[in-house]
Amino acid sequence: MKKIMTIKKNDRLIIDITGTTSEGYGVGKSDEGIAIFVPNSAVGDRVDVLIVKVLKRYCFGKVMEIIKPSEYRQEVDCKVFLKCGGCCYRHTTYDAELKIKEQKVKDAIARIAGLNVKINPIVGADVPDNYRNKEQFPLVKNKDGNVEMGFYGFHSHRVVDTDTCLLQPKIFDKVMAVVKDYLQTTNETIYDETTHKGLVRHLYVRYGEKTGEVMVCLVINGDKLKNETLLVNSLKENIPNLKSVVINSNKEKTNVITG
């Protein structure tokens, strides 16, 4: 029998979180059995939820209060968690994250292949943070004329400004700071993807884990920067093991980062 949607936007419900989606949302059900998807919730949480979106068969909610925290919950250590579209499990322990992903593999094999097979436990990373060897940072100018740099928000092209990421090497933080200072000092124009005007599109950084070498690349909607020598000298002064500085030209109207 099809469930009748009885929930309305701005309703408040207390639910238990019993599952997790592939995007890291906790899943609970109303007394009528209607599924409610809730960011920043973990299996085992009992939460007071504000309904923010109602669809035909399910709803989305926002945690207003954690009435009883899950044993898998941990303190969030990222200041842009839930704004940035990068991480969805910072509020759960790493062991819990591995179990969630293991279960998703089991569910996919059962649903798609119709097989009930043994899945070995996921082998976790020795160091779950600071492991990335590449980052690509989009840039914008805010209404005050200041350069913002960071990551796209979840399911959007809205840039979430940040000066760090817990998944990247610490040296990337310093590269971001040097480049942002250069852009502010030289007043370079920043690319606007809606108008296709402005010069600087992305900062692209690579790191060699074994060598410690760093490559810095600016992707631009043109051929050159105002003062490339100033940028190179600033990077050389502040970034140990700087191996190369690259200017990549991408003049296309595209979401592809490099040209």
PLM regions and their residue ranges:
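Accessory RNA-recognition modules of RNA-modification enzymes
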Residues: 2-259
